[in-house]
Amino acid sequence: MPTIEERDLRHIWHPCAQMKDYEQLPPMVIDHAKGAWLYDVHGKGYLDIVSSWWANLLGHTNEKINARIAAQLDRLEHVIFANFSHRPAIELAERLATLVPEGLTKFHFNDNGSSAVEAALKMAFQYCQQTGRTGKTRFMCLSEGYHGETIGALSVGSMDLFAEMYKPMMMDNIHIEAPDCYRCPYGETRDTCTCACFEHAEHAFAAHGHETAAMIVEPLLQGSAGMRIYPEEYLRKLRALCDAHDVLLIADEIATGFGRTGRLFACERAGITPDLMCLSKGLTGGYMPMSITVVKEKIYDAFYADWSEGKAFMHSHTYAGNPLGCSAALAVLDILDEENILERAEETASWLSARMEESFGAHPNVGEIRHIGLIHAVELVEDRAAKRPFDGGRRLGYAIYRCALRHGLLLRPLGDVLYFNPPLNIGRDDLDTAIARMKQSMDEVLGI
């Protein structure tokens, strides 16, 4: 009789992984979960300090979210969303309208983060075509940016790990050198930063603004690049530059939204309103695949016309606006409000920052500890003074990942950047456990 792991390997091709590596881990088959913990079929627990790809916002099997989904399941599980609607979607849009940055008024429902980005790109392009800006056909993005795995989303990303193979298929866009506050080429520090690097954006807009429909950006935090955090002032300057060149600004809040950066949305920290905003991951508490592209009224108005004019936005997904996902999202908003989650998370973040500094601040291979909200990242380097990274071929982060799994901690390093991105309501005992197990794993792999 084959084991459950052997049955998995026989048929399943897992995402974002080299299956030969996966075979050697060995595979972990999760049976159940509670709070920040996952438990495999053998009863072993794993502390999910990365919120299962940054999606689990309020803990696994949260009782309030469970109850809301269960109640909806007995009424309506799904319905076509083209020319039909339902209460959960209407209520969710109404609630979000009071929470998103001022000026964002219309909500287009999609299936997942990549599809929200695809919708935003198509909306921006079509908006320009339908408002007399027909020469604006390209997009701008930041180097090291990540916006999803579909072809359009890859085209506005800049990470070769995901995109190199598919470049012949991709759109030709303008990639702007992103801020790198740890290894600032201008010799500035986070405390002295004047955003000198913004000159790259200014040059790009001067050369290409006339042909650019939209600029897409992960506000304040480039997640997949290694939890790279950049200044709020950079985002404010980018908003002004887009306005000056009649370029739409798309904020990809898929990873940063719903409290991850200490505010409900990262754009709030900079006090800006994008023209389009993409939401997913924490939107449903990590329960259901759902996303929303939120836009300003002027975007919506450019599509509103008689059918004969051919201006409708014909982008659709089968499970757009799914009632179960909308119900989960409504429960998330209730919990955030009723349990003062953001305020409590801010207190936890301050405590965690001190604990991370205490535990890793003097480590000879820790180049920088950076954080925004509850997200904390530790960048490992071979030479701390020179900020020289380890040879990528060593796969140090992956080795620590494997070691941590043996100790019951789920990390998912970004290269040699180890990070915490836990549920917002995680307890301090769990965070202490995560710190201890991460340090143990680092020291074992580094031979300290």
Positions of PLM-derived features:
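Conserved N-terminal phosphate-binding loop of PLP-dependent enzymes in the Aspartate aminotransferase
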Residues: M1-I448
